[in-house]
Amino acid sequence: MQIKQRITNIAWKLLLPLLLILIWLLLSSLNIWSTYILPTPYMVWSEFVDCITSGLIWKHVGMSLLRVVQVFLLAAVVSIPLAIVLTASHRMRILSSGMIEFFRHVPPLALLPLLILWLGIGESSKIAIVFLATVYPIFLNALMGFSEVDGKLVEMAHQYGLSKKQIFLHVTIPYAIPYIVSGLRIGLGYSWRSLIGAEMIAASSGIGYWILDAQTMARSDIVIVGIIVIGLCGIISDALFRWITNRMLSRYMTGGDVYGA
């Protein structure tokens, strides 16, 4: 029954993309626009296959993936302990709340000109941009998870004689896990979005650079291939993240599934 339901869900998810491709085919056949503006699906597919067989696509995807993984892990290592510190210290949380709120509303790409001046046009400026975009959703979700632990559970743990360390390990962390996982998942998506923008401005490799280079050569078919590759990378990385977190953390969840699916 579950397999049948999954197949049905996949079919529904594919319905809209297939419909869009059919509309694209129809518009291409009517020759309303030149292929310079709107390439045919066949042109895009042909270029996609060529990029795979030539190895060009793997070069750019590999560089972007390496940057995303590095920054994502760094953001997680920084943001979760920081959330724990601010949860434990009310004074520190009040002191930092103004800066947190200010930079939460500043788009990371707005800082790119300054970061290029300070760090140069190499990897450091791109890493910094992606880090700033990734760290906030992880940090804010972790902070919410640690801060909103049910007071009744904590009180009950005190009554059973649990120490602060035991309460943190056996009450606070399991309660905060869904928030942390949600923040990590959002942060992973943000890391892809910000990286592509950073690579378009300051890079010599990566998917963003590849798309911008195609635009300068008036290759709209390659631009569309790049957009498709970004979407596929995001979908695959999100699915892999869900699989890993479900395997690692489902024992903490009563339903056996971190995402409740």
Go through the PLM ranges and name each one.
Residues 3-6, 30-73:
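Periplasmic/extracellular loop-to-transmembrane helix junction in inner-membrane transport proteins
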Residues 128, 132, 164-197, 230:
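Transmembrane alpha-helices
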Residues 90, 147, 182, 224-261:
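C-terminal transmembrane helix and the adjacent membrane-cytosol boundary/short C-terminal tail
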Residues 146-149, 156-176, 216:
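Short helix-to-coil transition segments within interhelical loops
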Residues 70-100:
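Transmembrane-helix boundary motif in ABC transporter permease subunits
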Residues 1-28:
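N-terminal signal-anchor/first transmembrane alpha helix
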Residues 48, 57-61, 65, 95-103, ...:
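Hydrophobic alpha-helical elements at and bordering transmembrane segments
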Residues 101-137, 144-145:
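Generic hydrophobic transmembrane alpha-helix motif, especially the helices
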